[in-house]
A protein has these predicted regions:
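Catalytic Walker B motif of ABC-type/P-loop ATPase nucleotide-binding domains
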Residues: 169-173, 178
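Conserved ABC transporter NBD signature motif
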Residues: 66-74, 83
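The feature captures the beta-strand-to-loop junction immediately N-terminal to the Walker
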Residues: 43-45
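Conserved ABC ATPase "signature" region
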Residues: 107, 122-140, 165
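Single conserved hydrophobic/aromatic residue that forms the stacking wall/gate
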Residues: 1-10
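Conserved ABC ATPase signature
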Residues: 118-119, 144-148, 152
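Helix-to-loop junction immediately C-terminal to a conserved catalytic motif
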Residues: 58
């Protein structure tokens, strides 16, 4: 039902929030098609619903109306397991992570592919190291996550999403917290991918 070669197709979708007594509509009539291999940026003023749209596209919250297809399949029909191997997400939310090395956090991107115990195979470890190298954070790999600056943490979360090896990756403000040279570096990396 999606367009041939499209990764994502949004048709007449409405986004917002349900509460017990009401629904808050953030945006309606959203239409878009994003094709494989494209780097697409969503720009807009603060408060217009960019993050709400991203959370909806990631299936973190339900859409209010319309249709969202990812790889030709309605987002509402994906299981949690299917979502974790289809969509990678990097949010700007800061979570406090203690007692974990950067390499271990990036390795968590492999969790959709590991067994119950989460043990990384030789291939998983290779993918983790490749993801770390792609984002150029090799010097951070053995550091504790809680010691990182905001910009360093952002790069680590991008490496984690890359290690997840999903066909679709959503990034909410991927250059937030980064200094100018790092912003340029991340945008070049995303363009290269």
């Amino acid at each position: 039902r999606g367009l041939v070669g499209s990764e994502m197709c949004i048709r007449d979708s409405s986004i917002g929030y349900h509460s017990k007594s009401s629904t808050k509509l953030v945006a309606k009539g959203i239409h878009s098609t994003i094709y494989s291999g494209e780097l697409t940026c969503l720009l807009g003023a603060n408060g217009v619903g960019k993050s709400t749209l991203l959370r909806t596209l990631s299936a973190f919250q339900p859409k209010l109306d319309g249709e969202i297809l990812v790889l030709g399949k309605d987002i509402d029909t994906y299981s949690d397991k299917e979502l974790s191997t289809t969509i990678g997400v990097v949010l700007t939310d800061k979570c406090e992570i203690r007692n974990m090395l950067v390499r271990e956090l990036v390795g968590m991107g492999r969790s959709p592919y590991t067994g119950f115990w989460g043990k990384l195979s030789k291939d998983d470890k290779r993918i983790v190291e490749e993801s770390i190298a792609l984002v150029r954070i090799e010097e951070l790999a053995s550091r504790m996550v809680h010691t990182l600056s905001d910009g360093e943490r952002q790069k680590v979360m991008i490496a984690k999403a890359l290690a997840q090896e999903t066909p679709v990756i959503y990034l909410d403000e991927p250059t937030a917290f980064l200094d100018f040279p790092s912003k340029v570096e991340i945008m070049q990396l995303l363009h290269h991918l």
